[in-house]
């Protein structure tokens, strides 16, 4: 193996946060101390208390094949559930994200609104025959719908592949075909405003 790569795999340097960052961070100094004492135990605790699992992982880190590390490889979760559902009981009206497009074109998307949009699209994808493991190409602009599309795919276990909108039709076809996409989500007009 290349010596430079080998050296990077054995990185020992530490980069502590600045005083200002520490004072304004959500993490307390005890977090840093706990992480320093036993990083695997620290991350296991974070994963088990901050993430909803369908099947809790029994192994924190598989580092048997560097640099292809696998974290929590035997755990099972749903990203869409963790991003949306777990917030509905207490924070449904809280803003999940702010979107800003053209000047004056802004939206505040609440968890409840995002959840409803995601469920509607994930059900539509299922009606089209999209299943867990299928690939869905996403050819959308930078709009709230791109977030909805990615979370809808995650909700049903489909893999999304965002395709850059600046490619020629031939390049788009190549990428969509290479991904073996079962379906493609796109606008029917060049711009969502048209």
Q: Where are the model-predicted features located?
A:
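Short, Asp-centered acidic motifs that coordinate Mg2+ and/or phosphate
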Residues: 183
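Conserved small/polar residues in nucleotide/adenosyl-binding loops
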Residues: 187-194
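Short beta->alpha connector loops at strand-helix junctions that form conserved
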Residues: 163-164
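Active-site charged/polar residues at nucleotide-handling catalytic sites that mediate phosphoryl
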Residues: 179
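Structured binding elements
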Residues: 157
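N-lobe entry segment of adenylate-forming
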Residues: 1-109, 113-116, 120
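Conserved AMP-binding/adenylate-forming core of the ANL superfamily
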Residues: 80, 97-151, 168-173
């Amino acid at each position: 193996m290349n010596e430079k790569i080998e050296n990077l795999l054995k990185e020992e340097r530490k980069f502590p946060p600045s005083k200002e960052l520490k004072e304004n961070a959500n993490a307390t100094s005890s977090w840093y101390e706990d992480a320093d004492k036993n990083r695997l135990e620290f991350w296991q605790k974070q994963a088990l208390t901050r993430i909803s699992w369908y099947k809790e992982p029994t192994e924190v880190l598989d580092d048997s094949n560097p640099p292809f590390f696998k974290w929590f490889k035997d755990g099972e979760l749903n990203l869409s559930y963790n991003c949306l559902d777990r917030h509905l009981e207490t924070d449904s009206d809280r803003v999940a994200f702010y979107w800003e497009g053209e000047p004056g074109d802004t939206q505040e998307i609440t968890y409840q609104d995002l959840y409803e949009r995601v469920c509607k699209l994930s059900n539509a994808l299922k009606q089209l025959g999209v299943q867990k493991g299928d690939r869905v190409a996403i050819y959308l602009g930078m709009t709230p719908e791109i977030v909805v599309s990615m979370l809808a795919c995650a909700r049903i276990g489909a893999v999304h592949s965002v395709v850059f909108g600046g490619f020629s039709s031939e390049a788009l076809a190549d990428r969509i075909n290479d991904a073996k996409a079962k379906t493609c989500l796109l606008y029917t007009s060049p711009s969502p405003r048209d």
